[in-house]
Amino acid sequence: MTPLYQLTVAQAREMLARGEISSLELTDALLTRIAAVEPKVRAFLVVDAAGARAQARAADARRAAGDASPLLGIPMGIKDVISTQGLRTTCASKMLENYTPVYDATAVARLKAAGAVILGKLNCDEFAMGSSTENSAFQQTRNPWNLERVPGGSSGGSAAAVAAGEAPAALGTDTGGSIRQPAALCGITGLKPTYGRVSRYGLVAFASSLDQIGPMARTVRDCAIVLRVIAGADPFDATCTDYPAPDYEAALTGDIRGLRIGVPREYFVAGMQPDVEAAVRTAIEVLREQGAEVCEISLPHTPYALPVYYLIAPAEASANLARFDGVRYGLRVPGESYFDELERTRGAGFGPEVRRRIMLGTYALSAGYYDAYYKRAQQVRTLIRRDYQQAFEQVDVIAAPTTPTVAFKIGAHTDDPLAMYLEDVCTLPLNLAGLPGLVVPCGFAEGLPIGLQLIGRAFDEESLLRVGDAYQRVTDWHTRMPEVREDGSA
């Protein structure tokens, strides 16, 4: 029998529905798994064992009473930038080390209403700023495939937990690739929905025009199940659209014959690891063999996406993080005056990467530089969005690499912020355009996973899920799980 911690969401749902296992048994199995591997992987910042068991018992009682909610009794983890009532939400920052929200984010509330069991909060880069989870103020999450490598970021804890069998699914957030990049590096499936598909209410904001909550799991089907629960209009988020959430599972037909898939030449960047490019191109050929029509396309403004992103995102972050001043909540360091106290508090509360982005954003918004930097970046953002609009007049889905390399060693880019920023070169253009992106495992190099990225039209997650599911029906990359060893190897 498959160990319970290896079950996918869909498998667990079926076994729970048939009465073969209880939610409490499943939750206990995962808590046991967490206890066994967490000292090595370090994906969780908070494990709420007592709360999870109580929720599992409640789920079993609901099922006995005839409830058949879509996630009833399914344990999940939550990235620690998403508010959870009564459960510490730190954003992996000293600034919010002891902050406990008094309300749930809309996405979390919807998970709970659907019967999900919340196992705890998952590590991330501080305030979701980073690509390796090395910027967490509390601990370094490690890639379960090789404990000397990063899991990616900023949703590194979410990706590592799913890959290591500590949770069948988790919520992550994606501002410039923070669901897709760690999903690729940890060998799991991750979906960044269209901007506005999922409510951001209760998400601690990094860059408000870019942030999006999405599911991370082992299979496309699991992501479809979770997305249907968390998607939809929310009166608490004016940027959340009122488009009805379709039945995403119904889109998983396995048939992609005649679907037009474009391959953008600009995504195969200079310096890309040859094995990564080969794996992605092989995966695209698999889609061709399944009946898809594949052609090369151009997204000419893609090379400008990186500098545009690193003007717009820090500018929004500098405004959003101004609220953390030590006056109303969070860390407070006494000073001789209000301004001295503010300087001491923010200096002690924010890590170096957060401070760097605040300074960069403040500069971009300052008088005399606004037109030259921020305004011009927004103009180029429009051109990037237009590139995608024109491409989708020719194709239905775009297929591309997710990362230029496999997971790098912990500490490899610590002293080189630009090298770290380049890790997101294939993912952040989607955020600027507000489009959905799906990552599925498509191979290995150096014993480390590689991810294929699928990009769709706005609010057409169904096509992405259909293509990703079709790919997973004829490949087994997504079924492979790492064996976490003491020596840091896989």
UniProtKB/Swiss-Prot annotation:
It comes from the Bacteria. Its EC number is 6.3.5.7. Keywords: ATP-binding, Ligase, Nucleotide-binding, Protein biosynthesis. The keyword Ribonucleoprotein does not apply. One of its GO terms (biological process) is translation. GO terms for cellular component: glutamyl-tRNA(Gln) amidotransferase complex. The active site is at K79, S154, S178. One of its GO terms (molecular function) is ATP binding. SUPFAM superfamilies: Amidase signature (AS) enzymes. Pfam families: Amidase. It is an enzyme of class 6 (ligase). It catalyses: L-glutamyl-tRNA(Gln) + L-glutamine + ATP + H2O = L-glutaminyl-tRNA(Gln) + L-glutamate + ADP + phosphate + H(+). PROSITE patterns: AMIDASES. Belongs to the amidase family. GatA subfamily. Allows the formation of correctly charged Gln-tRNA(Gln) through the transamidation of misacylated Glu-tRNA(Gln) in organisms which lack glutaminyl-tRNA synthetase. The reaction takes place in the presence of glutamine and ATP through an activated gamma-phospho-Glu-tRNA(Gln). Heterotrimer of A, B and C subunits. This is Glutamyl-tRNA(Gln) amidotransferase subunit A. It comes from Roseiflexus castenholzii (strain DSM 13941 / HLO8). The lineage of its organism: Bacteria, Bacillati, Chloroflexota, Chloroflexia, Chloroflexales.
